[in-house]
Amino acid sequence: MPKLNALVVGSTGYIGVQLIKLLVKHKYINIKYLCGNSSVGKKISNYDKYFLNKKLPKIIKFNKNLLKNIDVVFTALPNGEAQDISKHLNKNTTLIDLAADFRLEKSSDYLKWYKQKHRAKNLIKKSLYSLPEINGKDINNYQIISCPGCYPTSILLPLIPLFKNNLIKVKNIVMDSKSGYSGAGRGVHIKFKDKNLYESLSAYGVGYHRHNSEIEQMLKKFTKKNLDFNFTPHLTPMFRGILSTIYVDLEKDVTQSKIIKTLYNFYKKNHFIKILKADSLISTNDVINTNNCFISVCKSKYKNKIIILSAIDNLIKGGAGQAVQNLNIKFNFPIKSGLLWDMF
């Protein structure tokens, strides 16, 4: 099978670097171009010593002419920038976006949550918000693939099967997520320069974090009822990983064992989702440097409630790994291609 030519735009951010680490191990991918802005002319090894002995192109500035011989473009850019690139795609070029440009199905929602007008409205309907385990099977019908955010990934994977089977109530859901500071990007060091980033736990986006929008959009596909949930993210003094704790009310006569069995049956043929035994305690250490999601269902002191724990690596399953997983589905590559763990 010939290799696909890939272009990565936004090569030097935490997600971009992680993506390149995965792609250099992907036997069906040739990294033809790496693009950046302030990093033009530099080597990617300047940003991670892992690349010191890797043969990779120097970072250049993106221009639309680079797309001529490219099969797949990965965009790991600030929100809004992939929209401009999407307008110049060739007929046979796939765009996989790791930001939020094509996550929301309505341009009005994008304006509401991201405070900017969508500059490629006509392409929204040609894009797919692809959470691989849920709707990845539809990916072949789309040229633009939007990867879910890191927090929504950790929340939607345990909740969607339960919504789909009407096992939990759609009201009074509490989603409490804690992430390593890499989730805030390299700029987090500037933002916290006068504070001790490594000794502080802080909530942010309380009540209105942008990821509320895609969580609600996706969950609504699996219920006709009105949703009622609160989602609060936190930055923690660790580099990578997300642990989400989700509190839900059970429907009548639904038990903890029923919840676990449903999740197990839903994901039993999946390579990356692991449903643990009842009341298992999990940590981010269980999943960092992998494309896995660990899910545990725990009892509450109230019989009509359960507590769900969900752990992922925000840079892999919540970012670059999910992009590669979508790539593999789109081009019918073995699902684990580029997602092996001997590289870190």
Please identify what each model-predicted range represents:
Residues 1-199, 204-206, 298-302, 337, ...:
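N-terminal Rossmann-like NAD(P) cofactor-binding subdomain of oxidoreductases
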Residues 25-28, 164-168, 209, 220-224, ...:
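Generic secondary-structure signature for well-ordered alpha-helical cores
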Residues 244-344:
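C-terminal active-site/capping subdomain that shapes the small-molecule cofactor and substrate pocket
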Residues 208-231, 235, 239, 243-245:
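Oxyanion-binding "anion nests"
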Residues 18, 22, 157-161, 214-218, ...:
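Alpha-helical scaffold segments in soluble metabolic enzymes
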Residues 154-155, 182-186, 238-242, 254-256:
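Short acidic/glycine-rich loop or secondary-structure boundary segments that cap or lie
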Residues 203-207, 235, 283-287:
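Short Gly/Pro-enriched turn/cap motifs at secondary-structure boundaries
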Residues 91, 138, 166, 221-227, ...:
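Short, glycine- and charge-enriched coil/turn segments that flank and shape catalytic ligand pockets
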